[in-house]
């Protein structure tokens, strides 16, 4: 079969989550990562090359810490009363299935049509149902009209929203500011935004737009979770910061 756009890199990260789930003291449990790997093989998809897999394994502590941080972000958003969530470029992370969502939560996942089709077919074939009250996949190209497609799918622009942008910014051809302009335009006060960013540019911009921002560096985050990085992890996270922002006006 033709491999959907974005599926190879998503499978590489799924392999890292599958490995963490079987660690002695895992930061999270993702039983669905193996579902995607098996589904890819059964469909004739090519798994990531040995070189790609080795690169992912080399930053395993970083990747696991990143997943844990975004998991905690969504759990905290729900605890603070937010009921509308959006994951931009969701990939093959099955948060809609594996996190303990507050009743009444709606989760929108935006990604390439092929990625979402593969993801939902694999989980349906395995008999899995989302744990979130309402799950809405939004097939869209992030370079063209994604916010309109999100609204067409039922997104409420008047409701405070928790956004997540994970593992995406290096692939945004036009730079991040257009993406964050769109998010800002449709996020009322009380909305939250979690971003994996390189450097402080995103945080600085959000601060000028009425968002209250906190940051933590990748090395500090790995230390918090007891995942001290090796040389590969250190290189991967050298300039990476995790931005947590709340819109105040």
UniProtKB/Swiss-Prot annotation:
GO molecular function, one term: methyltransferase activity
Name of the protein in its database record: Putative S-adenosyl-L-methionine-dependent methyltransferase Mkms_0592
Family matches, as NCBIfam families: mthyl_TIGR00027
Binding of S-adenosyl-L-methionine, residues: 111, 141-142
Any single biological process term in GO: methylation
Protein role: Exhibits S-adenosyl-L-methionine-dependent methyltransferase activity.
EC nos: 2.1.1.-
Keywords: Methyltransferase, S-adenosyl-L-methionine, Transferase
Transmembrane segments: none
Pfam family, one: LCM
Species this chain originates from: Mycobacterium sp. (strain KMS)
Similarity section: Belongs to the UPF0677 family.
Keyword S-adenosyl-L-methionine on entry: yes
Enzyme class of the recorded protein, top EC level: transferase
